[in-house]
Amino acid sequence: MLAAPVMFIEGLVAYLILPVQNLTQPEDIVDFFNSNASLIGLVGLFGTVLSISFLGGLYVSYDLKDKGENIDPLNALSIGFKKFFPFLGAYFICSIAIFFSAFLLILPAFYVAGRLALFPPLMMLENKGVMDSLRLSWDKTDEHGGILFGLTLAFFLITFLVASLLQLILEPGIGQIAVLAVLEYVVVIPWGYVYFSLYKSLKNQ
């Protein structure tokens, strides 16, 4: 339920830009975006806010589940939203680090992604700042870099291969968009829990 609003908005964005697939001329593509830029931009901005709030709220939900407690999905999103700007900042810096590491080779990008993957629980559950959460994530995962690299690469490959297969099987349209949106979060939620479990394990040492 926590992911439902995010899946809906992301699906809506994909649906709004779906007609681009049928356009072959550059000027037609430019005209399409000129005509729909405001709507796509507004929905996309709302989707970004929801996505960041979801990621923050997800780790709060993990923590409460681990303690045998429950939280209303809207409350979890609300808690995530309160950390929107620092979470967005950390996510942006993390993305830049992964992007530049990909210039070396593709594989180092997965290593960096795995090493920085503990910043969400550090930020949401320990109230760490942007740079502190990234630094602590890197420091705490020093002995687990190889495992995190393997897990991050495996989750990415599973998602990529299944998504590619579904795109081949399903006709482009709202059905394909809906299935791919569900697939994304079927992978993201257990993927995030793996990182949360490592965070809890390191914290209890």
Segments from the language model and where they lie:
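Hydrophobic alpha-helical membrane segments
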Residues: M1-Q205
